[in-house]
Regions:
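N-terminal Rossmann-like dinucleotide-binding module
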Residues: 1-48
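Beta-loop-alpha module in the N-terminal Rossmann-like domain of NAD(P)-dependent dehydrogenases
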Residues: 19, 37, 50-110
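C-terminal helix-rich "cap/oligomerization" subdomain common to oxidoreductases
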Residues: 1, 67-69, 135, 267-268, ...
Length: 348
């Protein structure tokens, strides 16, 4: 970059503060403003020496950033993002992109109308591990992908549920956690056209699910299974295995598996399995270890976002991607409730 990209952050909760931290650490990014009506956000902005605004529209008008990160409550994402896009400001919208598919469609339409780019904050796409995994798949190293498996099994402590919304519909592990794994599989394998699912509340007996299992059909014919539970004493979870977030103990196990006609891949260790010669279950396997340079995916995402804002690259996760991931995730709830397969294919 010829000069530091001027970024603002709208919403200074937990994920907003993650973005603020990464922006301040990177020499090619400059934090030029924070918008959030809370006293804590004002205190944070003053401690960092950056302008603070209670109203994000004042920030956009007075600071005129090149790009804005929208990390407000989910229900406000689209209205805030629209305020940015209508001013020609490139926008990173945190996940989930919206509360509903119809709201997400508003963002897709607004982006097209304003001709201003949107990046949706599914940060795992930016992890070098997943970048390399996608390259291996796209190069044909696995042959035709046949099966994909994702495990998101972990244990949230009782205190986590002191906040009432976490015990209510929409606050469970499907929309909070599994959406990451669904987007990751969409990135690696392709679009999801059908979802079947079961869920359970058997452990905690809350209104919201504690466990869900879904079967996915991908557009290119592969099938997938995803399992999520926040009530299991288990190490099989991307957050534990990939080491993206320091607050979780690192576990040297794998959580995602992609199997094809010529080879299979485990993640996050990037072990590629294939046959030495004849392809048969009687033949010996070889295990090829692929290495990548570790990098913080949130930082990688912001660097990519700066390039998007400068119109140098296309968004790695578009507004339509955010919509399609949300649609597939909400379909897990619908399929579990109805007992029927949910069609998530694009209209003909």
């Amino acid at each position: 970059m010829s000069s530091a990209t001027r970024l603002s952050v709208i919403g200074a909760g937990a994920i907003g503060r993650t973005h603020i931290d990464r922006i301040r650490r990177h020499p090619d990014l400059t934090l030029v403003g924070i918008a959030d009506p809370t006293p804590a956000a004002e205190t944070l902005a003053r401690s960092l020496g950056v302008p603070w605004f209670a109203d994000h529209r004042q920030l956009l008008e007075q600071v005129k950033p090149a790009a804005a990160v929208v990390a407000t409550p989910n229900a406000t994402h689209i209205d805030v993002a629209a305020d940015c896009l209508e001013r020609g400001i490139a926008t990173l919208v945190e996940k989930p992109v919206a509360d509903s598919v119809s709201e997400a469609q508003r963002l897709v339409d607004c982006e097209a109308r304003c001709q201003t780019p949107v990046l949706v904050g599914h940060h795992r796409r930016h992890n070098p591990i997943n970048q390399r995994a996608k390259a291996l798949i796209d190069e044909g190293r696995l042959g035709r992908v046949v099966s994909a498996t994702a495990l998101a099994l972990f244990l949230k402590p009782d205190a986590y549920f002191d906040a009432a919304w976490r015990r209510q519909s929409g606050g469970g592990p499907v929309l909070i956690n599994l959406i990451h794994d669904i987007d990751m599989l969409r990135f690696l394998v392709g679009d999801i056209v059908s979802v079947q699912a079961l869920d359970s509340r058997a452990v905690r007996d809350f209104e919201v699910e504690d466990t869900a299992v879904a079967v996915l059909r991908f557009a290119q014919g592969a099938l997938g299974t995803v399992s999520v539970s926040d009530a299991t004493a288990s190490p099989w979870c991307w957050d534990f295995c990939a080491g993206e977030q320091g607050q979780y103990p690192r576990q040297e196990v794998q959580s995602h598996f992609i199997a094809g006609t010529h080879g299979s891949l485990s993640l996050p260790d990037l072990a590629l399995w294939n046959y030495r010669g004849q392809r048969s279950w009687h033949a010996e396997f070889t295990r090829e270890q692929t290495m990548v340079h570790a990098a913080d995916p949130y930082t990688c995402q912001l660097v990519h976002f700066a390039a998007v804002a400068e119109r140098r690259v296309a968004p790695l996760c578009t507004a339509l991607d955010g919509l399609r991931t949300l649609q597939a995730t909400l379909a897990v709830h619908e399929a579990a409730m109805t007992g029927q397969a949910v069609d998530t294919s694009l209209p003909k």
